[in-house]
Design a protein with these regions (language model features):
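Non-globular targeting/processing and membrane-anchoring segments
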Residues: 2-47, 51-136
């Protein structure tokens, strides 16, 4: 979570993020970064406080929003303005990240199983060839 010092919406954003993270099995730490200069804001692509990112991705991407040291305004589900990311956006970003990680894990495990099966087939073929050659 990226914020400017004295951000009036920090606590609400933190509560919503903590609540969203508790829906998972694994405890995930929250990294709080205070952005204190325009140089830092530009380096981080900081578009206002508070900004929540999951695995580096903004939970409410707004490419047209300028970089700077300012409060950030969000839209709620009714179209009104709020001072922190909507909890639905936070949860959706976390769920998307978890699904992507799970799919990556499943692909890696499937590759390991396939490699193990190939190695077992190779070993079995080698043993069978040796047996036939000793019989012949």
């Amino acid at each position: 979570m990226l914020v400017v010092e004295d951000c009036p919406h920090l606590e609400q954003a933190r509560r919503d993020l903590e609540s969203s993270l508790r829906t998972g099995i694994i405890e995930t730490p929250i990294q709080l970064i205070f952005v204190s200069s325009l140089d830092d804001a530009e380096f981080l692509g900081f578009q206002g406080s508070p900004t929540i990112r999951v695995n580096g991705d903004d939970v409410v991407p707004q490419p047209a929003l300028p970089v700077g040291l300012a409060c950030r305004v969000y839209r709620d589900t009714d179209g009104g303005t709020i001072g922190s990311p909507p909890i639905e956006s936070i949860r959706a970003a976390i769920d998307s990240h978890r699904r992507a990680r799970l799919e990556e894990f499943q692909r890696e495990e499937a590759a390991k199983v396939a490699e193990f099966a190939r190695a077992a087939d190779t070993a079995e073929s080698s043993s069978e060839s040796e047996r036939k050659s000793s019989e012949g």
